[in-house]
């Protein structure tokens, strides 16, 4: 059966390709027709540009990007018990492709009734800031600074508010993203390029600095800023991947003397199903995501700037990878990519 995919054959080149692929199922497998697929700009562009500390830097090209999708089951193996044909699901780490095969308990999760498939496609991506917020262990009334307002940062700000943080302060260089963050419930939105940025953050937190910080940019200058303004004995969680990570920081001044907790929150540290020692798995985070989404407390539809055809892959990645003001969120629409898949 044919399958369409997007991949990077070389640096700064994206290709949409259709080729024959084996769709034979093992007894415990399902075939998922992908409906929508959200581009994760930070991770995907790091590989697109062949930056350090990426999969491409280790395994080289070709690279197959994409990890957060929604779809529906069109074929099941003889031993599958959990799903039936027609069930809506989200899949993790499936790549940008028209269909995927999954074992019924392997990073696949049912979509509840009442959830739009476009919103559901963000489930796996949204679980990353959920991991960061869980690890921060925010207490009611603690201030939280979110540095960076891309997709992850905009979701992290909403989750910090849900967790009880006040005030929620966000920062981003883009005026449009700062305004969107305010619309989504942030209390303050600051420009990190302003010369008095650190002083403003401290002023907004009664002179103490925020007790909790989510660093989403992966930028070394942003990391330095948050270490300067975080409160004594505060917690800083590193959510954004620091691709160029060998620049020095004054550990004695900004971490040791201030008693700061520096917390890693890479998704690879979280189990898919069995709760971690601090009590949550990837599946738990999906469940929470859908609860918050259905209740209206978490919003992701306003993060989507454009719904695009996968056939336009090269133009899409040129737009987000080469533009000075790239779109925030691009959702790939696979519903018209048929590949002779049974319906």
Predicted regions and their residues:
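C-terminal substrate-binding/catalytic core of Rossmann-like NAD(P)-dependent dehydrogenases/reductases
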Residues: 250-304, 315
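A structural motif shared across PLP-dependent enzymes of the aminotransferase-like
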Residues: 41, 93-105
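Mid-domain Rossmann-like dinucleotide-binding core that forms the NAD(H)/NADP(H) cofactor-binding site
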Residues: 116-195, 199
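Glycine-rich cofactor phosphate-binding loops and adjacent beta1-alpha1 units
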Residues: 184-263
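C-terminal capping/lid region of NAD(P)-dependent oxidoreductase domains
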Residues: 207, 237, 244, 248, ...
């Amino acid at each position: 059966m044919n399958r369409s995919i997007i991949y990077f054959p070389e640096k700064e080149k994206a290709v949409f390709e259709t080729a024959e692929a084996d769709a034979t199922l093992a007894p415990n497998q399902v075939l998922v027709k992908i409906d929508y697929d959200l581009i994760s700009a930070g991770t995907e562009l790091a590989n697109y540009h062949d930056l350090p500390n990426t999969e491409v830097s280790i395994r080289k090209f070709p690279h197959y990007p994409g990890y957060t999708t929604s779809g529906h089951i069109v074929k099941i193996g003889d031993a599958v018990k959990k799903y039936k044909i027609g069930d809506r699901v989200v899949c993790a780490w499936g790549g940008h492709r028209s269909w995927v095969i999954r074992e019924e308990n392997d990073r696949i999760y049912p979509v509840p009734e009442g959830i739009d498939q476009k919103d559901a496609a963000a489930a796996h991506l949204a679980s990353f800031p959920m991991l960061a917020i869980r690890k921060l262990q925010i207490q009611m009334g603690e201030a939280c600074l979110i540095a960076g307002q891309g997709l992850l940062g905009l979701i992290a700000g909403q989750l910090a508010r849900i967790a009880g943080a006040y005030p929620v302060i966000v920062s981003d260089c883009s005026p449009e993203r700062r305004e969107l963050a305010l619309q989504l419930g942030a209390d303050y939105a600051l420009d990190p390029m302003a010369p008095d940025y650190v002083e403003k953050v401290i002023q907004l937190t009664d002179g103490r600095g925020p007790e909790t910080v989510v660093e989403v940019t992966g930028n070394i200058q942003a990391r330095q800023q948050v270490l300067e303004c975080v409160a004594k004995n505060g917690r800083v969680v590193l959510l954004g991947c620091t691709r160029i990570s060998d620049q020095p920081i004054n550990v004695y001044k900004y971490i040791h003397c201030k008693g700061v907790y520096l917390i890693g929150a890479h998704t690879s540290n979280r189990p898919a199903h069995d709760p971690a020692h601090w009590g949550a798995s990837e599946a738990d985070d999906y469940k929470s995501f859908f609860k918050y989404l259905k209740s209206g407390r978490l919003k992701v539809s306003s993060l989507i700037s454009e719904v695009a055809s996968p056939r336009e892959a090269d133009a899409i990645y040129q737009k987000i990878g080469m533009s000075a003001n790239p779109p925030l969120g691009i959702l790939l629409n696979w519903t018209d990519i048929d590949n002779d898949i049974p319906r």
